[in-house]
Amino acid sequence: MFKIKGLRWYMIGLVTIGTVLGYLTRNAIAAAAPTLQEQLHISTQQYSYIIAAYSACYTIMQPVAGYVLDVLGTKVGYAMFAILWALFCAGTALANSWGGLAVARGAVGMAEAAMIPAGLKASSEWFPAKERSVAVGYFNVGSSIGGMLAPPLVVWAIMAHSWQMAFLITGALSLVWALCWLYFYKHPKDQKKLSTEEREYILSGQEAQHQAGNAKRMSAWQILRNRQFWGIALPRFLAEPAWGTFNAWIPLFMFKAYGFNLKEIAMFAWMPMLFADLGCILGGYMPMLFQKYFKVNLIVSRKLVVTLGALLMIGPGTIGLFTSPYVAIACCASAALPTSPCPVR
């Protein structure tokens, strides 16, 4: 049978496309917010409830989604969640009030809670430990790409047809991807198009529990007592409000504060996401550059990256000092840059 060279990179490419489409469906509500406010007479406070519904359901469902993925496996579990978020996203088109939108987006949040855990699980299955951070970096880039695509695509759908069409299109794209995932994704042990050499390279470079396929699950109490867990959770808790702001509020901010029309939103609202992508790439190289040119060790170099990121986060706090909308966008973009290299991402 024909073997595909470097098949693991095709698999992470498939994961990345799923992340792109997941964040496209997530950010569609933000790009459509000005139109929704006008046509459904939704206040800014009511819009915040819609966003809160998504975030709350996403948060509550994440540990449940991780458990379901462990039980059903990456292939079936991720496909199931992706089909659900695609249908719920398309179902958003049926809403005619802020309450209906909150229910629909909450359902999307519950399904999309599996997106990042599934990506991490696929990376652990398909990559040796030494390459896993690179693989995770690739599919994390998909989150920003999805955020970049949402404003122009959603605005185009609204101007060409209606806001309902924007959610139907984004939902349909995710549904197509879910079916492709179900067809193409297999564990390395079951993938017949994977060469023997690459299979051995992947499995020999994995931790013992992945090789044997019998990783022991940690209890909730063990996780909460784990220092590594808190090393990831605390930075995320502190940085996630910024990332959530970029995902949910920039189009509406540009519309309310600077009077941008839909075309202008489509032209500029994606820029912070572009800088988040750049940060995701640069964040991997900056520690090496600090070590090379400043002669510091690995730990210090990583601390310098995090410190530099924290300084850049000051940008949005200075928006009130300027009247130019383009300076405001630049301030937001500067703060989006470190959301990827920091531990939160």
From Swiss-Prot:
Subcellular location: Cell inner membrane
Cellular compartments per GO CC: plasma membrane
Keyword annotations: Cell inner membrane, Cell membrane, Membrane, Signal, Transmembrane, Transmembrane helix, Transport
Gene3D superfamilies: MFS general substrate transporter like domains
Induction section of the entry: Induced in the presence of D-galacturonate. Expression is regulated by ExuR. Maximal transcription activity is observed within 8 hours of bacterial inoculation into potato tubers, well before any visible symptoms of disease are detected.
Disulfide cross-links: none
Topology with respect to the bilayer: Multi-pass membrane protein
Primary location recorded for the protein, binned into one broad class: membrane
GO MF, any single term: hexuronate transmembrane transporter activity
Null mutant phenotype: Mutation of the gene causes a reduction in growth on D-galacturonate and maceration of potato tuber tissue.
Pfam families: MFS_1
Reactions the enzyme catalyzes: aldehydo-D-galacturonate(out) + H(+)(out) = aldehydo-D-galacturonate(in) + H(+)(in)
Transmembrane segment boundaries: 49-69, 76-96, 100-120, 139-159, 165-185, 237-257, 265-285, 304-324
Family: Belongs to the major facilitator superfamily. Phthalate permease family.
Job description of the protein: Transport of D-galacturonate. Cannot transport the dimer digalacturonic acid. Uptake is an active process.
Protein's name according to its UniProt entry: Galacturonate transporter
Organism: Dickeya chrysanthemi
Gene name linked to the record: exuT
